[in-house]
Amino acid sequence: MMKTSKKFQKALFIFRRDLRLEDNTGLVFALEHAQEVILCFIFSPEQIEHNPYRSDHCLQFMIESLEDLEKEIIAKGGRLYLFYEKPEKIVAELIKKQHVDAVVVNRDYTPYSIKRDQKIDATCKKLGVSFCSFDDALLHFAFSIPGCRR
């Protein structure tokens, strides 16, 4: 029997709005293309600290959703790691300490999210790691629709 090798040794998959195991484009890619996948969620200071966009109800819903996701992952023999820091700092630390060679995410389209992903991509490039992002939450890529601008 022929042994198949995968493209990546260790991938980091970062959950964001996609708090599910089923029908998750980026997660499926990571599982199919990496020998090992680290699953994490990163609370950024902007989500937690008081600001005009923060909602206690939204934060509570996110925490409850993460608890449900963690139970699903544990039931499948995995682990969900939770972090609190600027995402690019966590990514850099995990790349160095865990020898991650790919960071995988599903795209998000808010101005904040686009800037966040640009910083993560720059961190990955600086450290020689692949950054893979996928359209997942929408039927059509957000900026492919006429009249939709960045």
Question: Where are the regions that the model predicts?
Answer:
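Trp/Phe/Arg-rich N-terminal binding region typifying the photolyase-homology
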Residues: 2-150
